[in-house]
């Protein structure tokens, strides 16, 4: 079977890579990205769209078997690979280090993220001059959804609801701005960027949960993405207004989102974090993607 590399064409390849990620999740969960992360990245206004054409795709006679790409900018690179093609690892790493370098705090070069369970990939990375940087690793935790779902608790006067009940982009913008520790009120000229994030093709308003304060403001938010073709779901993002933390509101939003996914058949929820916030509600660390750094050759 022949193998060939070509460059990414967004109009042609965006949906094809979504399907590829869906297929390899079913074959080998969750070593590669889940499809919603690809979709969320492309809905985010911070993504560098000028250099998408530098993404590389490998294909066999039946379609895509590997992709090298960034999430938001050059220099922070991810590799998605069909487990049937381990022989492509060296070529894909070499491509990343040669063609996808960026200007970062560490200097000019690139980080490539590799699942720690893939020790062979790590050996190849080291042989090519990459160095592991644990301080930049990406943890992954999962929540195995129990048959008897835990009771969800809320303080008096607060409620949870979905964005299908009320879709107020300005309220979402405010809780996300404050929830990610930005002081004051959010810039009004960023509301349309927020709307774009909430308009991805597979975004589900009915699974995305907010906690509503007595004054009607959203004070906690949990985004939820079903993983196509599976019984998994992915949490992204979660934020709580700092004035309303340690009240159980974030936990209530996350659990209500998971509960709704479970009602549709989900059996596991994933989140890209190992924070105590998630572990305290029953998540367990299930994997880590190590960041491997290589400075650009002069």
Which residues does each PLM region occupy?
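Conserved donor-binding loop and adjoining core beta-sheet/short helix segment
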Residues: 10-15, 22-103, 114, 212-232, ...
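Conserved hydrophobic beta-strand within the GNAT/NAT acetyltransferase core sheet
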Residues: 110-113, 235, 268-273
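Short, high-confidence coil segments that cap the C-terminus of an alpha-helix
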Residues: 53, 105-107, 206, 266
């Amino acid at each position: 079977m022949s193998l060939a590399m070509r460059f990414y064409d967004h109009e042609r390849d965006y949906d094809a890579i979504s399907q590829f990620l869906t297929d390899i999740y079913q074959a080998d969960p969750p070593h590669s990205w889940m499809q919603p992360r690809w979709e969320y990245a492309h809905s985010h206004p911070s993504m560098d769209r000028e250099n998408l054409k530098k993404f590389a795709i490998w294909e066999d006679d039946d379609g895509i078997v590997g992709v090298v790409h960034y999430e938001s900018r050059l220099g922070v690179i991810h590799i998605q690979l069909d487990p049937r093609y381990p022989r492509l690892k060296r070529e894909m790493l070499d491509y990343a280090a040669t063609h996808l370098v960026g200007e970062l705090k560490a200097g000019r070069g690139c980080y490539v993220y590799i699942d720690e369970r893939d020790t062979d990939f790590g050996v190849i990375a080291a042989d090519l001059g990459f160095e592991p940087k644990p301080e930049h690793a990406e943890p992954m935790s999962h929540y195995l959804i129990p048959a008897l779902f835990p009771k969800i608790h809320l303080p008096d006067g607060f409620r949870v609801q979905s964005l299908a009940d009320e879709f107020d982009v300005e309220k979402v913008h405010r809780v996300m701005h404050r929830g990610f520790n930005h002081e004051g009120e959010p810039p009004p000229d960023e509301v349309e960027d927020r709307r774009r994030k909430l308009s991805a093709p597979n975004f589900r308003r009915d699974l995305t949960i907010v906690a509503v304060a007595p004054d009607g403001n959203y004070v906690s938010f949990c985004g939820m993405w079903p993983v196509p073709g599976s019984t998994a779901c992915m949490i992204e993002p979660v934020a709580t207004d700092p004035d309303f933390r340690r009240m159980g509101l974030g936990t209530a939003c996350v659990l209500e989102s998971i509960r709704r996914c479970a009602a549709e058949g989900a059996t596991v929820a994933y989140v890209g974090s190992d924070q105590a916030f998630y572990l305290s509600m029953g998540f367990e660390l299930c994997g880590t993607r190590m960041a491997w750094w290589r400075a650009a050759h002069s």
